[in-house]
Amino acid sequence: MVFLLCFFLVADVSYGINGDCELPKVVGRCRARFPRYYYNSSSRRCEKFNYGGCGGNANNFHTLEECVKVCGVRSRDSPKEN
């Protein structure tokens, strides 16, 4: 049991994914179109979306650089590694 707990803690730290980054993309209930970035847990990349301006959650970043820094991943527009 202790081994499993340690394994999951190490796995979580090694992937470096902030819990906020696992939240779903939420456009919000208002109708603005602010360009923002969110971490897509399916593609494991930061991707652009249009934020409505109200509501939402913590998986909402003003810049691509901020998303990559917080979530520790490449962006969708980054060149693929060989």
From Swiss-Prot:
Signal peptide location: 1-16
Disulfide bonds, paired cysteine numbers: C21-C71, C30-C54, C46-C67
Protein name: U-actitoxin-Avd3g
Family as reported in the entry's similarity comment: Belongs to the venom Kunitz-type family. Sea anemone type 2 potassium channel toxin subfamily.
GO CC annotation terms, alphabetical: extracellular region; nematocyst
SUPFAM superfamilies in the cross-refs: BPTI-like (SSF57362)
Key words of the record: Disulfide bond, Ion channel impairing toxin, Nematocyst, Potassium channel impairing toxin, Protease inhibitor, Secreted, Serine protease inhibitor, Signal, Toxin, Voltage-gated potassium channel impairing toxin
Pfam families xrefs: Kunitz_BPTI
Propeptide residue span(s): 76-82
Domain BPTI/Kunitz inhibitor: 21-71
Keyword Disulfide bond found: yes
Chain's role: Dual-function toxin that inhibits both the serine protease trypsin and voltage-gated potassium channels Kv1.2/KCNA2.
InterPro entries reported in the protein's UniProt record: Kunitz_BPTI, Kunitz_BPTI_sf, Prtase_inh_Kunz-CS, TFPI/VKTCI-like
